[in-house]
């Protein structure tokens, strides 16, 4: 039996705020930029939060074609992909095989780097939290292609919509270089719309300044 499912970005933002996943303020990023917000998906560490995130991923996947296997990069992507497989089954009556990778290859038992469903000859969607520099995604894409997979696309929780070292964002660079789609559940624009709706003018002004300086 399936239940109606419709991901609500505002509800997800509110949950992220309540869990400390999303914070507004001043945060120095690895790039040296001082960001007016910070997003840490590792704090989506309870059943309700993980369930809402997985619902979002599942809803997105139902709009995508060619979903043979879903894949979660180690380590953070592993619970995300497992929960998404459950959400697809429970909310959409769609049973999708899933897998993940190890950080280090195993030389005993089943061995290798990949765990779970076979990706050989399959169209695979990668599920992760964010794409910051794109390094991790590129590594996973290489692993999957070496195993015979075709990369159908990538799903992330947040698109920061800001430039990297050049004029493109990390997501745009990945899309251009790897020629695959990347979809996000929420974007920086969604965060700004949320602040605007809540009348948080000071935080919104800081977001707008940051967007003008670094946005795409």
UniProtKB/Swiss-Prot annotation:
Keyword Cytoplasm attached: no
Reactions it catalyzes: orotidine 5'-phosphate + diphosphate = orotate + 5-phospho-alpha-D-ribose 1-diphosphate
Pathway: Pyrimidine metabolism; UMP biosynthesis via de novo pathway; UMP from orotate: step 1/2
Binding-site list for orotate: 38-39, 132, 160
InterPro entries: OPRT, Or_phspho_trans_dom, PRibTrfase_dom, PRTase-like
CDD domains: PRTases_typeI
Residue numbers binding 5-phospho-alpha-D-ribose 1-diphosphate: 30, 75-76, 102-103, 106, 108, 128-136
Gene Ontology annotations of biological process type: 'de novo' pyrimidine nucleobase biosynthetic process; 'de novo' UMP biosynthetic process; pyrimidine ribonucleoside biosynthetic process
A GO CC annotation given for this chain: cytoplasm
Keyword annotations: Glycosyltransferase, Magnesium, Pyrimidine biosynthesis, Transferase
SUPFAM superfamilies: PRTase-like (SSF53271)
E.C. numbers: 2.4.2.10
A GO MF label: orotate phosphoribosyltransferase activity
Obligatory cofactor(s): Mg(2+)
UniProt subunit comment: Homodimer.
Family of this protein: Belongs to the purine/pyrimidine phosphoribosyltransferase family. PyrE subfamily.
Role description: Catalyzes the transfer of a ribosyl phosphate group from 5-phosphoribose 1-diphosphate to orotate, leading to the formation of orotidine monophosphate (OMP).
Annotated protein name in UniProt: Orotate phosphoribosyltransferase
Organism this protein belongs to: Acinetobacter baylyi (strain ATCC 33305 / BD413 / ADP1)
